[in-house]
Amino acid sequence: MKVDVIKLDGKKAGSVDLDEALFGLEPRADILHRVVRWQRNNAQAGTHKVKTRREVSYSTKKIYRQKGTGGARHGARSAPIFRGGGVYKGPTPRSHGHELTKKFRKLGLRHALSAKAAEGRLVVIESIAMDEAKTSALAKQVKEMGWKRALIIDGSDVDANFAQAARNIEGLDVLPTMGANVYDILKRDTLVITKAGVEALEARLK
């Protein structure tokens, strides 16, 4: 599929042929859902923890005598039925991550790229190289382009001046090719890829 290429100032800079196997698939929500869940589960800290009966700070002494009170029989104050007592089978620290094959992860990335192309929200830019790291100048260009929530994917290395200028612009994320992932692509409204990024993605996802 042929897509127009633009410069950072918005002017046209020719066109590029995109691989149909990467950008021309029929997006499948089930594949995207599985990959996003895998990403988010792996990112979850899993540090949740409550105190069990043996961990709460209470004496193990019987709270009152067994018989003659007219009340129910009880032992220690740390029992789960009491306020402030230990929690029975509560959450403990654990990993929420699960396995997903490399082949399936690559497939998910192809479908994410295809989804943006199908929505008409894929932009190919010639280069994002800047002479100096000026946030104000880049913010003005981004506003003129209409990129309110955009992910920009560069080649193997992101231009240092551009990365510094973009760091303080709200709604703008910049990643190298190896950092491209399904969750970040779907999270942003517009996907912007440099020509170097397109070549690197095609090499990565062969």
From Swiss-Prot:
Pfam families linked to this entry: Ribosomal_L4
Gene3D superfamilies: 3.40.1370.10
Gene Ontology cellular component terms for the protein in this record: ribonucleoprotein complex; ribosome
Domain of life: Bacteria
HAMAP family: Ribosomal_uL4_B (MF_01328_B)
Summary of subunit composition and partner proteins: Part of the 50S ribosomal subunit.
The protein's name: Large ribosomal subunit protein uL4
Species the sequence originates in: Jannaschia sp. (strain CCS1)
Lineage of source species: Bacteria, Pseudomonadati, Pseudomonadota, Alphaproteobacteria, Rhodobacterales
